[in-house]
Amino acid sequence: EAQSRLIHWETPPQQILDDANPPFRRWFVGGRTNLCYNAVDRHLDSRGEQLALVVASSETATTRQFTYRQLYRQVNDFAAVLRRLDVSHGDRVVIYMPNMAEAVFAMLACARIGAVHSVVFCGFAAHNLALRLDDAQPKLLITADAGMRSGKVIAYKPLVDAALAAAQAPPAQVLVVSRGLDPDLSLQPGRDLDYASLQREVGQVDVPVQWLESNEPSY
């Protein structure tokens, strides 16, 4: 009960623990909250200009810093793009990206709108990604153009293409965040979408939070 007071609840829980069906237990039953709101929104008034995220990339030799207010903006921009792609509460999204700021934005954006995200390690080959796509059966796959390993550029898009060809339940759309690492990046019309282009179309939108019952999955 003491821990529950550290969380913002849109609707307070009616019961702290329901253990009527062991070994399955439900915590904070009836409470409605949102992980993105607790990670970002609740800090805007008191910590808006405080650093919330620092991403130091050995791949691009850059460091990017975001205050809570800047993080809020980036997450809402990403959430607005997801909504444009008709991703909503309960939909599943697979994220196949390296350690980059946009991976964080994508996870928080999914949580914000109530979509369930699954992060797949970007070191996995196409076959392994295909297996996870079949398990999750996502509405959308989010990826990057490329990453770097030991100084070598690793293009992700060919791996994604191979995975989608092998999967039994591939997503209908692929959202690609390009950092300009792969000069040969090729998008398949009708399936692949460029994040930056979509974000410019959508513009800056404050996306409402989808409040979830405490035991609903966010990831």
What does each of the following model-derived ranges do?
Residues 87, 135, 168, 211-214:
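Alpha-helix termination/capping residues and helix-transition junctions
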Residues 17, 39-70, 178-186, 217-218:
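AMP-dependent adenylate-forming
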Residues 49-51, 174-177, 186-219:
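Conserved pre-ATP/AMP-binding loop-to-beta segment of ANL
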Residues 43, 74, 78-81, 85, ...:
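Generic, well-ordered alpha-helical scaffold segments in large soluble proteins
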Residues 36, 53-108, 125-130, 190-200:
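Conserved AMP-binding/adenylate-forming core of the ANL superfamily
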Residues 94-101, 120-124, 148-151, 208-211:
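Alpha-helix capping and helix-loop boundary segments enriched in small/acidic/polar residues
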Residues 1-14, 31-54, 215:
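A short N-terminal helical cap/helix-turn-helix that marks the beginning
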Residues 112-196:
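Structural core segment of the AMP-binding/adenylate-forming
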